[in-house]
């Protein structure tokens, strides 16, 4: 057995752990005067009623004991000066990771914090929303090829964020993150729904679109490089047309991890598909060659439902995306080239040491008022992340080790009790077309509303409390009042699409705000609401149905949808 693996096991062959919790650290909470509150660290994730411990330990997760390599208990940080800074001699690091060749090190080892940036994977999932204007532009296009063209540009532009080489923190099981756009255009919620494999789901809702992103990444270590493979699904619905888009993203390689200057390369095919029209974009991210001109280059075609090339796409994923349209006729003449997207250059002073610009830095912004309403599961309040952001690396590394040790103990407890852990806000179901889908139950935003009301009421007489510093999203344009449908259902008999119906609802003065529920094509589960004399139910079997008409008699009304059928009846 090599010296490396001897360090990982005891004499009896069982894995040994080098992680030890030696000290407690303050929690990043503040009172309304801006003074830091210093309870025991564990309360941040264990003692609160909304904490990971109380919310998730009772639920358990699938038995994964056999999936954990002995390397799971090996910690580099303790042998590198508590990871205060990167080791000068990278050869010493190679001695520790050399045995990982061909393995997935991200799931097998605990890395020191000098490898990290003060973000979690959940936060990074929302970085594509930096380019939300391209989705909004697509929604205004009258031609489906044009819509696909701008959504393709959106999916290329997002890679301009992925040049940083620092690693985000892995979310804990059940960890969450919320984000509300400062311009009020959308709201997003993320939850870590699985630990092995690591899967996080992000659900973004706006008046213009609904987007669900699944982060599911595996890696393979090759000595001085790391392959990164993405397996997650991405679903986008444009509310103006009811169109459903999905995409698959290319792979990546992180070069020169041990020796040389680290850099990231994306390669392979990006495929964006419109499931309503059958149109598809196939864009190739080219591998770098010997010459600089080939670096970060992309090119490909947008195809119509018959497989004919309609648009040629080219560019560099970190700089620009251009398009040249082909005519539909026999001549196949091309139009002039247009620029779909061009990177905005931020001034150097906008960036921090991790190369985060203003938008990315905004993901971690939280006033004391905002922090008061965040749940203890939110990525912003993780103390290892906070300490790293403050550049207190020694404390960050100790806190990270404590959190990981606590999570392993909770996992072992669940396994011993044979408990099955379930996410709080998403549920997984089988899907005949996509294999599976994740359904968002909307409860997080209801819980948040209650927290906001409670905090605002508690500090309403405090002159230092400014409720305007708590981000809010105007849900009136999204929510519907189920109990009020019957008395105004006749107003919608001419509605021809779910979007028109949705907009009609949004103009009403609602009597109450029930759980936010999107109308088709985003209906995902049964929703029922009842009063003393009235009951209504949504039934959903498809995401592609369109509203055809509404029929009503003295006792009931029925919404008629195109095949495959979705029925909605009330009595």
Curated annotation (Swiss-Prot):
GO cellular component: cytosol; membrane
Low complexity composition-biased segments: 43-54
UniProt GO molecular function: sterol binding
Tagged with keyword Coiled coil: yes
Polar residues bias (residue ranges): 33-42
Alphabetic keyword roster: Coiled coil
Coiled-coil ranges (or none): 387-420
Superkingdom of the organism of origin: Eukaryota
Residue ranges of the region described as Disordered: 1-73
Entry-linked Gene3D superfamilies: 2.40.160.120, 3.30.70.3490
Family matches, as PANTHER family: OXYSTEROL-BINDING PROTEIN 11 (PTHR10972:SF202), OXYSTEROL-BINDING PROTEIN-RELATED (PTHR10972)
Family: Belongs to the OSBP family.
Name recorded for this polypeptide: Oxysterol-binding protein 11
Native organism: Dictyostelium discoideum (Social amoeba)
